[in-house]
């Protein structure tokens, strides 16, 4: 058991100040956890991606699941079970993107880079790098479609988001 540390207010002062302004203009108190548009998006954590803007939606419309590389992991599947059975999701868009670091090298490259930059041995972690984005997208979509705890009626599609043009390019999966 560790002793709780005080919140590092000085390091997060910009975040807390912005939240104060957000609270003053907040108008979403009537939203529920239900996805109004019945959509979940699995995408990357890359800060160039604004999932709601990309698909023309707003808060309350979509469930957004993010991780490095937009990979369909065990945790993504767990979350989709909740989203489909309890929160109104009937369709899933798996949306990796161009210029993704997870698609620019293999596991050993990532481990080596982290070790060089930080001196940390990360070989105990599997980063789920991607050697071919399109092939991996097809495989990840298939993983959702084949997961026995998800509804058979769930519609799943894949598209690659271009971070330089903003365009979604659909992929036959």
Locate the predicted segments by residue.
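Divalent metal-coordination and catalytic microenvironments
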Residues: 19, 41, 65, 94, ...
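Short helix-loop-beta junction
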Residues: 56-64
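Short hydrophobic segments within beta-strands
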Residues: 42-44, 95, 159
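Gly/Ser/Thr-rich loops at beta-strand to alpha-helix junctions
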Residues: 45-48, 98-102
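N-terminal short beta-loop-beta anion/metal-coordinating cradle
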Residues: 21-25, 30-57
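Pocket-edge structural micro-motifs
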Residues: 43, 66, 172
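Ordered, amphipathic secondary-structure segments that act as subunit-interaction surfaces
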Residues: 87-97
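Divalent-metal-activated hydrolytic enzyme cores
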Residues: 1-35, 69-75, 82-87, 101-173
């Amino acid at each position: 058991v560790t002793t709780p540390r005080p919140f590092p207010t000085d390091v997060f002062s910009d975040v807390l100040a912005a939240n104060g302004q957000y609270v003053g203009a907040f108008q979403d108190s009537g939203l529920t956890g239900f996805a109004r548009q019945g959509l979940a998006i699995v995408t990357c954590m890359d800060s160039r991606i604004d999932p709601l803007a990309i698909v023309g939606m707003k808060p309350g419309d979509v469930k957004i699941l993010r991780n490095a590389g937009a990979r369909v992991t065990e945790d993504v599947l767990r979350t989709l079970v909740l989203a489909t059975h309890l929160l109104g999701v009937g369709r899933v868009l798996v949306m990796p993107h161009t210029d993704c670091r997870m698609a620019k090298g293999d596991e050993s490259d990532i481990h080596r880079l982290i070790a060089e930059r930080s001196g940390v041995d990360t070989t105990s972690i599997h980063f789920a790098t991607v050697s071919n984005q399109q092939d991996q997208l097809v495989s990840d979509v298939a993983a959702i479609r084949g997961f026995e705890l998800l509804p058979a009626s769930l519609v799943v599609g894949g598209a690659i988001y271009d971070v330089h043009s903003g365009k979604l390019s659909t992929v036959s999966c």
